[in-house]
Amino acid sequence: MQVTQRWNREQAISLFNKPFFDLLFQAQQVHRKYFRLGQVQISTLLSIKTGNCAEDCKYCPQSSHYETKLDNEPLVQLPQVLAAAKKASDAGSTRFCIGAAWKKIHDRDMPLLEQIVTGVKAIGLETCMTLGILKPQQAQRLAKAGLDFYNHNLDTSPEFYHSIVTTRSYQDRLNTIENVRKAGIKICSGGIIGLGETISDRAGLLVELANLPEPPSSVPINMLVKVRGTPMFDNKDVDPFDLIRMIAVTRIMMPTSYVRLSAGREQMNEQTQAICFMAGANSIFYGRKLLTSSNPTEDSDKRLFRKLGMQIEKHTTIKNSNWKKKKLLLHDNQQHDNTISS
């Protein structure tokens, strides 16, 4: 179900400026209307190609433009990806996300990516990828393989964007999101706070997302993880109340989207995370590592969920017809193999 409203920046800013408890109350009302209280969706993120990225995103340690002492890693192959996906499934994740430090996907990598989607779905997980700029025909191929989600963040407002990135335009990002939408893949798109942006920039980001033809199915809200060697290492820390306000306004403006408390959780105490969940966050990344940054352990997340009385949401995705056919073929082949071996 999609609930859409055209937003303008003034309306969004007025939400940010609400008294804190009034804002929290409104966000909680919206959250209770469209989601089960106390349910959290769990994703696991794997980097299949780390570092040496041609982009100059000022927040990112994977950029080749900065000296961050990050160990570059080559492309991970299918068996290692599927082993990681199985481990994520066993730990309780319902979605497996694949990231690569690319500006764009090369056609030569498409067969591997298609095999990854098919293999991960055979494990029973939803699939998500974040691989940079995506051309229409590439989006269609990934959709045919069964890809559920594609992540492509807008990062910040259109006005502030070029202070952060110069190697990819804002329109490039919007074009990729449109290619994803037209291919029938669900959109995952959000942004980062702590880049030096203003309240107006945060409002502008959310207006862009909320006013897409279809708001994203999933909206990750990242808090800047400062890495020595990047231009943003000396940025001011994000005030926890600013993060909570960002979560709450996101929930109000995109009532049916999953709001993911994403990068930066390792720097948050349990109380901050709890209020973020109260403000409308209902998704997290699970596992010790997010691309290159640390993340709370599964055990610490489970302890927090127990304290809050929260439960992991069960996997309910309906697979597309192409995937159903592939699943039936896979099942038939397995039955045939069992007959031969018996």
From Swiss-Prot:
This protein's record includes keyword Zinc-finger: no
Highest taxon of the lineage: Bacteria
CDD domains membership: Radical_SAM
Binding, [4Fe-4S] cluster: 53, 57, 60
Gene Ontology biological-process annotations: biotin biosynthetic process
Residue ranges of every copy of the Radical SAM core domain listed in the record: 38-262
Enzyme Commission number, as recorded: 2.8.1.6
Enzyme class: transferase
Molecular functions per Gene Ontology: 2 iron, 2 sulfur cluster binding; 4 iron, 4 sulfur cluster binding; biotin synthase activity; iron ion binding
PROSITE patterns per UniProt: RADICAL_SAM
Catalytic activity: (4R,5S)-dethiobiotin + (sulfur carrier)-SH + 2 reduced [2Fe-2S]-[ferredoxin] + 2 S-adenosyl-L-methionine = (sulfur carrier)-H + biotin + 2 5'-deoxyadenosine + 2 L-methionine + 2 oxidized [2Fe-2S]-[ferredoxin]
Binding site for [2Fe-2S] cluster: 97, 128, 188, 260
InterPro entries named in the record: Aldolase_TIM (IPR013785), BATS_dom (IPR010722), Biotin_synth/BioAB (IPR002684), Biotin_synthase (IPR024177), Elp3/MiaA/NifB-like_rSAM (IPR006638), rSAM (IPR007197)
Cofactor note: Binds 1 [4Fe-4S] cluster. The cluster is coordinated with 3 cysteines and an exchangeable S-adenosyl-L-methionine.
Pfam families xref list: BATS, Radical_SAM
Membrane-crossing segments per the record: none
Requisite cofactors: [4Fe-4S] cluster; [2Fe-2S] cluster
Biological or metabolic pathway of the protein: Cofactor biosynthesis; biotin biosynthesis; biotin from 7,8-diaminononanoate: step 2/2
UniProt keyword terms in alphabetical order: 2Fe-2S, 4Fe-4S, Biotin biosynthesis, Iron, Iron-sulfur, Metal-binding, S-adenosyl-L-methionine, Transferase
Binding partners and assembly: Homodimer.
NCBIfam families: bioB
PANTHER family (alphabetical): BIOTIN SYNTHASE, BIOTIN SYNTHASE, MITOCHONDRIAL
Job of this protein: Catalyzes the conversion of dethiobiotin (DTB) to biotin by the insertion of a sulfur atom into dethiobiotin via a radical-based mechanism.
Family: Belongs to the radical SAM superfamily. Biotin synthase family.
Protein name in UniProt: Biotin synthase
Organism of this sequence: Baumannia cicadellinicola subsp. Homalodisca coagulata
